[in-house]
UniProtKB/Swiss-Prot annotation:
Keywords: Disulfide bond, Heme, Iron, Metal-binding, Secreted, Signal, Vasoactive, Vasodilator. The lineage of its organism: Eukaryota, Metazoa, Ecdysozoa, Arthropoda, Hexapoda. It is found in: Secreted. Heme-based protein that deliver nitric oxide gas (NO) to the victim while feeding, resulting in vasodilation and inhibition of platelet aggregation. Reversibly binds nitric oxide (NO). Also binds tightly to histamine, which is released by the host to induce wound healing. This is Nitrophorin-1. It holds the Pfam family Nitrophorin. It comes from the Eukaryota. Residues 1-23 form the signal peptide. CDD domains: lipocalin_NP1.
Length: 207
C-alpha cells in the first residue's frame, strides 16, 4: 500500500513520482500580474481538466481532482478532492494558506474525512506551495510543488476550469505557452468518467 504522503500527492493535484524520489521544483513559476485573489478564492469549485507532471514515473493514468478555494473566519482555505475512477477511492484534504506574495501560497494540510473529521493532522515539514500563474473568471493555470521533510518532490502544472466539461480556452493555453510549456504535453482528465462531491468539498472550507 502506498504511504499517506504518496496518496496525498495525488489528492492535492501533485501526481508526483513515488515518495522518496525527489526533484527540485522550478523557481521560475511566476504569479499572474494583477492577480485577483477575490475571484479565485470565491468559495466555488475548480476542476482539474489537464495536467503536466514533470516527475511522471509513478503517475496514475486516470484520475479526477477538484478543489474549492475560499475564505473562512478570515483565513484563506483550500479543500482538495481526488477520485480514482478505477478503484473508486476518494481523498479529502484541507489546508490553511499563507500568502507569500500575491498569487503565491504555502499550504499546511491535514487529511480529513468528507465530514471534516481529521484522519492525519498537519505534519511539520510536509506542505505544498502553489502559484497562480494565470486566472480569469472561468479558467486558471497553477504550478504546485509538494514538499516532504522539506524536500521537493517535483513540479506539477494544472489547468483548472469552473466547468468540468469545458475544454481549455485560448487564454489559458496562451498562459501555458507564456510559461515556456507546450499544451500538447498536458494530459486531459475529461474522459475519465469523473465523479465529484462538491457539497462536501465546499463544506470543508469551514472545517
Amino acid at each position: 500500500m502506498k504511504s499517506y504522503t504518496a496518496l496525498l500527492a495525488v489528492a492535492i493535484l501533485c501526481l508526483f513520482a513515488a515518495v522518496g524520489v525527489s526533484g527540485k521544483c522550478t523557481k521560475n513559476a511566476l504569479a499572474q500580474t494583477g492577480f485577483n485573489k477575490d475571484k479565485y478564492f470565491n468559495g466555488d469549485v475548480w476542476y482539474v481538466t489537464d495536467y503536466l507532471d514533470l516527475e511522471p514515473d509513478d503517475v496514475p493514468k486516470r484520475y479526477c481532482a477538484a478543489l474549492a478555494a475560499g475564505t473562512a473566519s478570515g483565513k484563506l482555505k483550500e479543500a482538495l478532492y481526488h477520485y480514482d475512477p478505477k478503484t473508486q477511492d476518494t481523498f479529502y484534504d484541507v489546508s490553511e494558506l499563507q500568502e507569500e506574495s500575491p498569487g503565491k501560497y504555502t499550504a499546511n494540510f491535514k487529511k480529513v474525512e468528507k465530514n471534516g473529521n481529521v484522519k492525519v493532522d498537519v505534519t511539520s515539514g510536509n506542505y505544498y506551495t502553489f502559484t497562480v500563474m494565470y486566472a480569469d473568471d472561468s479558467s486558471a493555470l497553477i504550478h504546485t510543488c509538494l514538499h516532504k521533510g522539506n524536500k521537493d518532490l517535483g513540479d506539477l502544472y494544472a489547468v483548472l476550469n469552473r466547468n468540468k466539461d469545458t475544454n481549455a480556452g485560448d487564454k489559458v493555453k496562451g498562459a501555458v505557452t507564456a510559461a515556456s510549456l507546450k499544451f500538447s504535453d498536458f494530459i486531459s482528465t475529461k474522459d475519465n468518467k469523473c465523479e465529484y462531491d462538491n457539497v462536501s468539498l465546499k463544506s470543508l472550507l469551514t472545517k
